[in-house]
Amino acid sequence: MGVRWDGQRVDAIDRDALPGLEGRSGLLRTFDTPEFRDMQFLEVTSRTALNKVPGNGFMGGAWTINPYRGCQHACVYCFARGTHTYLELDSGRDFDTRVVVKTNVAQALDAELSRMRERPERVMLGTNTDPYQRAEGR
C-alpha cells in the first residue's frame, strides 16, 4: 500500500496536491525497523514547523508544532486519527503503524522564526500526536 508521495524526489511537484501545496511532498525515505515490528516510518521534509490554530475557541490563536503525523501509542480514543486520511492513509491501523516523521522540523522552525516580525509568545508542542514517539528512545 502506497501513499501519494511514493517514488517522488524531494524537489518533485505533486500535481494531485491541493492548490499551493504542489511542491511540498518532500519524501526522504521510508524504512522498517526490527525493534518496532509492523511499524513504518515515513521521513519527510517540511517547509514550516509552526501551525496557527484558527478561531477563538479553546486553542484559537495558539501556535503549535507537530513533529509527527500518526502515533505509536495507538490510543483508540485519539482525536487526531482522522488527520491521517488527509495523507490517503486510514485512521485505524495506518495511524498506529505508519508514522510520518518531519526530519527537519528544528531547522524549519529556526528559519520560520527568523522571518517573523512578531514571534509567538508561546508554542504548544505535540497537540495533534505525542511529540515523543517510542522509536526516539532507540
What kind of feature is each model-predicted range?
Residues M1-P34:
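Polybasic, low-complexity association/targeting segments
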Residues D32-Y68, V76-R138:
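Conserved Radical SAM active-site core
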